[in-house]
């Protein structure tokens, strides 16, 4: 793929293999994803190997092998949504799959930071790198991330929302896969403004993350829905 590639406001649907990025030099940025959508892949939406990948305001959604896999490399994620309600196969992979190194140990260990984001759906939030045994001694960190699973903060997880529900506007029966937030979302105002890059101030729909005191987690700013009036 080369270096310094950028996907801005890209909407990639229904791919067989998703987007694949591999690099020999993780000190040079291979890919920046900005306010984009990688959705509905036959395998996984993103596979990055030993690459420097950045993503801001981006949705990774719906794939049977997990929506995003990172093997070693440098990973910087801010204001992203990892969601999986894939319909057509059983979901086998976690939403976020992280491998600190490749199996052969050729690559340097991963340098990963995931901030102000959401991991939610029918599969696991993260693969077993998240276990206390496996994550200790790594440079893998999560700040202000909403997880479906039960857990607690420690030296690699900071200010996270555990057993949360983002209340996506999803209706699988009607094939509606809208990963914006409903009024009751646990992701509302749970972010850290200092972790939101100025470049990510506006989401893909033009909504301002800084318009309210609290920063919402995930790719999309919560927009209040009118309350139904009693008849």
Where are these regions (language model features)?
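Surface beta-loop-beta hairpin patches that serve as ligand-binding interfaces in beta-rich domains
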Residues: 174-177, 185-231
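Bacterial Sec-dependent N-terminal signal peptides
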Residues: 1-11, 37, 52-57, 69, ...
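Right-handed parallel beta-helix
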Residues: 1-61
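Glycine-centered loop/turn positions within well-structured domains
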Residues: 17, 44, 53, 65-66, ...
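Intrinsically disordered, glycine/charged-rich C-terminal tails and inter-domain linkers
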Residues: 2, 6, 32, 76, ...
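Predominantly extracellular beta-rich ligand-binding scaffolds that present long acidic/polar faces
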Residues: 57-180
């Amino acid at each position: 793929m080369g270096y310094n590639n950028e996907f801005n406001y890209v909407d990639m649907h229904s791919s067989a293999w998703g987007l694949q990025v591999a690099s020999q030099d993780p000190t040079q940025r291979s890919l920046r994803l900005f306010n984009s959508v990688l959705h509905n892949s036959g395998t996984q939406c993103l596979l990055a190997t030993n690459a420097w990948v950045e993503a801001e305001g981006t949705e990774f959604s719906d794939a049977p092998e997990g929506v995003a896999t990172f093997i070693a490399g440098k990973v910087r994620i801010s204001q992203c949504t990892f969601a999986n309600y894939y319909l057509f196969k059983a979901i086998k992979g976690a939403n976020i799959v992280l491998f600190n190194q490749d199996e052969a140990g050729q690559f340097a260990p991963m340098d990963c930071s995931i901030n102000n984001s959401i991991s939610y759906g029918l599969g696991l939030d993260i693969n077993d790198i998240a276990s206390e045994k496996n994550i200790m001694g790594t440079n893998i960190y999560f700040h202000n991330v909403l997880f479906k699973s039960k857990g607690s903060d420690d030296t690699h997880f900071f200010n996270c929302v555990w057993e949360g529900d983002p209340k996506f506007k999803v209706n699988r029966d009607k094939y509606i896969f809208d990963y914006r937030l409903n009024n009751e979302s646990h992701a509302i105002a749970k972010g850290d403004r200092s972790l939101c890059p100025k470049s990510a101030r506006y989401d893909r729909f033009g909504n301002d993350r800084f318009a309210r005191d609290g920063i919402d987690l995930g790719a999309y700013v919560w927009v209040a829905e009118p309350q139904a009036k009693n008849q």
